[in-house]
From Swiss-Prot:
Protein name: Glucokinase
Entry EC no(s): 2.7.1.2
Native source organism of the sequence: Synechocystis sp. (strain ATCC 27184 / PCC 6803 / Kazusa)
SUPFAM superfamilies: Actin-like ATPase domain
Keywords: ATP-binding, Cytoplasm, Glycolysis, Kinase, Nucleotide-binding, Transferase
Amino acid sequence: MGAMGVNFLAGDIGGTKTILALVTINESSPGLARPVTLFEQTYSSPAFPDLVPMVQQFRQEAAFVLGNPISVAKACFAIAGPVIDNTCRLTNLDWHLSGDRLAQELAIAQVDLINDFAAVGYGILGLGSEDLTVLQAAPVDPSGAIAILGAGTGLGQCYVIPQGQGRYRVFASEGAHGDFAPRSPLEWQLLEYLKKKYSLGRISIERVVSGMGIAMIYEFLRHQYPERESAQFSKLYQTWNREKDQETKTVDLAAAVSQAALEGTDVLADQAMELFLGAYGAEAGNLALKLLPRGGLYVAGGIAPKIIPLLEKGSFMQGFSDKGRMQSLMGTIPVQVVLNAKVGLIGAAVCAAQS
């Protein structure tokens, strides 16, 4: 594939912050080589009018720290937004990015833009055992498909297919917009509550399995069981509800609910996370049934690493495995949680090396 120690520029671009990294990959290694970071820096995205001056500053800083300018073979940037024909207009930032324009202005032979969750798909390939927690151990087939889903602000899904000779291809998915399928009387009541709240005829799984989903589940439960709500959470909820349409917020209800469930200090929070984890696991199982990911199913996103003890308690894996006649099949699929918060940045580097 090329000489040893080829250098790439990788970036994880968000509306608030951008992480840039100069990485090297030994392309002569057999199989997929993991990227090694030479220099990394985090910037405030709104502080720059465009990505170009940010990258120029980054390269100057890298040259100063490393002692000399480093040539870059290719670049790949993971972006929180839709990427069409290697272009993207960021939702929360007045940037319109084009891979061709960036390549020309930065004097880099090739610049690829990819969606941030597609970057997570590539990033899985660059992780080590220290970056993962096992929820279900099973033999991994190196030639098998890999499935990834991750709840955070929304619910991302994608899958990875090996192409042979240490190369992989990531495919995006909009599976999170599939229907939420209730499995219990309480989940049916949750569905009807959300349909009425949003004036919709259907509810997507993302409205339940996401950070906002946790908040909505708690809101539903306090509506169903007002006598179970503690005075502390009643006050938190009222503040959150008052501020939710404001730019400045002082309460993150989803974080408060999950933390209380971790500490076992609130009955309604415990129940909310049980509902959330059951639905999360069920959707992970649905994805696994569709893809049969013998290469593993990975739970990514911002929520999972923060609630490992809850994931290990059983509701998630019970929802995953409870597939009727297919239950024994579900036990053959490796399931792991991604702990490394920089998986998207790693993925951008892996993508650059493969493109």
